[in-house]
């Protein structure tokens, strides 16, 4: 049996059990996603919103689409358009908040337009922010890794859309305090070398984890 590139483990942090990941040699973002997905089907891990706190995630109606702003990463944007057999501009006009798009930020409608009876209708091509969502405690280092990867992908989507003429350059006109905070974060991440990894990738398997582990 070969070495597993990414594996999950449980530890305690701040007196509570939490989930973390460790890498065993070279690994890709797809390896991380492959390791992460089984958490959703693991009924032995404490989940805040699950029935009796221990259940699989399938069918749960308290999901990322209802509890978080859904901002797609670049790989997800491309995969969504392909999955839905539409062009990028139509994808944005139909499923994203146009006032945010006009300000240079890609953000799904609220509630998410892809929710059908509380279930994601594009599950195979959902965004990183959705793939990583789980209502259990995550170790700090792992949480920071996931945050960094997700924000990098979201930033890459904004950079790409701007270059393609699909959105305008970022503007703070008429934006909320949250929008302004998000714009500051995106501007900060634009200078990160890891953004290029998303811009040059076709799939999550094309993105190495190492640059995010040692930025």
Task: Please give the residue ranges for each predicted region.
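Short loop/turn segments that flank or connect secondary-structure elements
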Residues: 1-215
């Amino acid at each position: 049996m070969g070495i597993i590139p990414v594996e999950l483990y449980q530890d305690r942090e701040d007196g509570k059990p939490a989930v973390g990941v460790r890498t065993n040699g070279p690994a890709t973002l797809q390896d991380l996603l492959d390791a992460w997905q089984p958490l959703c089907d693991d009924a032995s891990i404490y989940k805040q919103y699950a029935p009796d706190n221990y259940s699989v995630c399938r069918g749960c109606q308290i999901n990322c689409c209802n509890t978080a702003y859904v901002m797609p990463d670049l790989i997800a944007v491309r995969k969504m358009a392909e999955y839905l057999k539409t062009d990028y501009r139509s994808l944005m006009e139909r499923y994203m908040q146009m006032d945010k798009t006009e300000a240079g930020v890609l953000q799904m409608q609220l509630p998410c337009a892809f929710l059908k009876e509380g279930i994601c209708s594009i599950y195979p091509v959902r965004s990183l922010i959705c793939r990583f969502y789980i209502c259990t405690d995550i170790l700090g280092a792992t949480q920071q890794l996931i945050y960094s990867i997700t924000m990098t992908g979201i930033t890459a989507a904004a950079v790409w859309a701007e270059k393609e003429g699909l959105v305008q350059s970022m503007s703070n006109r008429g934006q909320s305090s949250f929008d302004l905070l998000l714009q500051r974060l995106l501007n900060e991440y634009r200078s990160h070398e890891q953004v290029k990894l998303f811009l040059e990738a076709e799939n999550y398997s094309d993105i190495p984890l190492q640059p995010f582990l040692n930025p």
